[in-house]
């Protein structure tokens, strides 16, 4: 009830420090005081009625201050994206010059910050030793003694994304499909702006190409079931799908469901590096093949498939090509035109956006790609995904895509440095370790390691202050060895010894040091 009162009473009296403790609750120190804090700073709704909306810009500029109580006494402004990060002088020493790499492939060269540091590694050390955009202060992470390195399971919301979402969780609450008044128009525009941001991230051409869903699982189901059932109805002979043995579970389970409906599925085995051979795909295509689906970046071992050549092959053979890019979007450059991608699944919470929102890209081309809807109702999303759109989640998803477009190059340099740092340290200090998956064609924010003779689950339990995983979060409740590792030829015993480490935009050097030391 108190939270409802917060939304209702939106006028501020003491704007200066209104949300300090709320933002600082990430340290779990002020949670019990949040309601009291807000109720003391919100009073009436007069300001809301002036122009139909609160002056959110002034509200944030005056209230969202972060870090005034930090150990160095500095004040960081959440709205402007300025955050101080302090790196511990730990006991781990690796030659940083070795990892300087300014030639990383990316189509993003601009950075949305006011710092002179634009992502270049200089002689003083890696870029994240400077003042960079990072929501969590290094000293606070030390104080919490809890470190998150499970970024393939989910990522934290970027503060710029949260900032963009807040108005749509409070006073901009119209239904995007209410076409008769300002509230609906305002929400509809926000949704279309988010579509544009997603298109810009992947080089799409038309806003109608983006269909919002609840996440990558729904997007994958809609792509596979929607396409196969539609084209099979037109031609009963068309009933063949090609995929790989190392897809995400939601692809594999959807294919198994289609098999119960009479469809034929070919599961291709990758090589020992986790890469599917182009010749194997070519040899699997038959006259009755409808589509091929291959994961862009593998969620367990981080390997990047040869998506462009697969797309070209599918175009040449006149079959549809779908890719699950939930681990790739916002992290590696994607050009759906150049790569000839017909359908692509994305997820908000894998690129520093909110959970519960995803999208399916469907290319506009001639002849048009057709598919059957899975959810029926009011006809939203061009009739392919009925249901009221969650405007705040869509806005967050779109803003996350926009931020990724600006910062992908710098993020890639950061995670690549951490990957090489950990790899060199472990190789130097430990015997009997294996780095799984191709070490070249990969996303460097994902590291999968087998520690021979050490049970992976036991290792995770011994590192209880560091969040890691032994595989996909969707299957982590089982004690079975990773089916991905088994598919690339790793024995069951060794597969049981593997753990996955995930670096991200907000990973700090101190966290990486603690991982290595422990």
Question: Predicted regions: what is each one?
Answer:
Residues 21, 61, 71, 77, ...:
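A periodicity- and composition-biased signal for non-globular, repetitive helical segments
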Residues 1-73, 77-90:
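N-terminal mitochondrial targeting presequence
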């Amino acid at each position: 009830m108190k939270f409802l009162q917060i939304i209702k009473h939106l006028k501020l009296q003491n704007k200066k420090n209104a949300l300090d403790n709320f933002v600082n609750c990430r340290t779990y120190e002020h949670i019990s005081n949040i309601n009291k804090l807000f109720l003391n700073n919100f009073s009436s709704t007069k300001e809301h009625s002036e122009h139909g909306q609160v002056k959110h810009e002034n509200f944030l500029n005056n209230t969202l201050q972060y870090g005034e109580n930090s150990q160095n006494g500095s004040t960081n402004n959440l709205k402007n994206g300025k955050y101080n990060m302090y790196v511990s002088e730990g006991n781990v020493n690796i030659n940083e010059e070795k990892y300087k790499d300014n030639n990383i492939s990316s189509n993003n060269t601009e950075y949305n910050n006011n710092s002179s540091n634009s992502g270049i590694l200089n002689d003083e050390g890696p870029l994240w030793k400077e003042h960079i955009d990072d929501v969590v202060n290094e000293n606070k992470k030390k104080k919490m003694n809890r470190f998150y390195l499970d970024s393939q399971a989910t990522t934290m919301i970027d503060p710029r994304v949260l900032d963009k979402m807040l108005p749509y969780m409070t006073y901009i609450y119209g239904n995007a499909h209410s076409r008769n008044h300002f509230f609906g128009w305002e929400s509809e525009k926000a949704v279309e702006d988010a579509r544009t941001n997603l298109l810009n991230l992947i080089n799409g051409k038309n806003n109608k190409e983006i269909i919002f869903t609840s996440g990558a699982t729904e997007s994958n189901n809609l792509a596979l079931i929607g396409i196969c059932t539609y084209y099979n109805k037109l031609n009963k002979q068309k009933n063949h799908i090609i995929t790989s043995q190392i897809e995400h579970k939601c692809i594999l389970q959807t294919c198994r469901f289609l098999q119960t409906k009479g469809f034929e599925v070919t599961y291709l085995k990758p090589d020992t590096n986790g890469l599917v051979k182009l010749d194997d795909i070519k040899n699997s295509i038959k006259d009755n093949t409808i589509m091929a689906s291959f994961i862009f970046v593998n969620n367990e071992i981080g390997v990047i498939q040869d998506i462009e050549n697969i797309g070209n092959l599918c175009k040449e053979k006149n079959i549809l090509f779908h890719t699950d890019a939930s681990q790739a979007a916002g992290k590696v450059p994607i050009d759906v035109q150049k790569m000839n991608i017909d359908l692509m699944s994305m997820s908000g919470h894998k690129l520093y956006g909110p959970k519960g929102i995803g999208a399916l890209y469907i290319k506009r081309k001639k002849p048009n790609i057709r598919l059957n809807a899975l959810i029926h109702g009011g006809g939203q999303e061009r009739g392919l995904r009925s249901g009221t759109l969650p405007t705040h989640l869509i806005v967050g998803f779109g803003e996350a895509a926009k931020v990724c477009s600006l910062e992908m190059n710098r993020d890639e340099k950061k995670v690549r440095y951490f990957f090489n740092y950990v790899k060199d340290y472990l190789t130097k200090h430990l015997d009997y370790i294996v780095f799984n998956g191709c070490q070249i064609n990969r996303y460097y924010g994902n590291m999968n390691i087998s520690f021979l003779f050490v049970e992976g689950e036991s290792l995770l339990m011994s590192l209880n202050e560091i969040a890691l995983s032994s595989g996909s979060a969707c299957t982590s409740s089982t004690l079975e060895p990773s089916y991905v590792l088994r598919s690339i030829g790793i024995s069951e015993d060794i597969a049981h010894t593997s753990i996955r480490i995930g670096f991200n935009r907000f990973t700090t050097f101190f966290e990486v040091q603690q991982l290595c030391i422990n």
